[in-house]
Regions:
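Short runs of predominantly hydrophobic/aromatic residues within well-ordered alpha helices
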Residues: 17, 72-76, 110
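Charged interaction scaffolds used for protein-protein
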Residues: 101, 110-113
Length: 133
């Protein structure tokens, strides 16, 4: 299901935001010690572990190196997957949660707190610490 289809399941954007917030808090509380990006050395993925790019001299190109624990995505990736998001074309996106939601018609003031949670997670905080906003 595309993210737009997940959002459309709710009666309003406000309801979607409310459910997303509740589900992020639930996931962060249930997995409070989980550190998605240990050592602040990688970037966020909505569909897998944290990663970084490293130059491979043999290939003369950058390759993606996994730097986080095996999982199905960052806190927002996992939350939105739990809400039904499974579109393989959309999920590899590496942008911020703010950009994802702005691209779906949400307003900055509604999603500012989500960006703070994602920034905390991406800076090496445990999910329990990341949601304390």
């Amino acid at each position: 299901m595309k993210l737009s289809e997940v959002i459309a399941k709710y009666s309003s954007q406000d309801e979607f935001i409310s459910v997303l917030k509740s589900e992020v808090i639930k996931l962060g509380t249930e997995n409070s010690d989980f550190i998605y990006n240990p050592g602040f050395i990688g970037s966020c993925s909505y569909s897998g572990p944290a990663y970084r790019f490293e130059f491979d001299d043999e290939l003369c190109d950058y390759v993606q190196i996994v730097v986080g624990p095996e999982c199905k995505g960052c806190i927002f990736g996992q939350t939105m997957q739990n809400m039904g998001w499974d579109n393989e074309e959309e999920m590899p996106y590496f942008g911020s949660i703010s950009t994802v939601l702005l691209n779906h018609g949400f307003h900055d003031k509604e999603i500012r707190v989500f960006q703070e949670v994602q920034s905390n997670q991406d800076s090496g905080a445990s999910w329990g610490e990341a949601i304390k906003q």
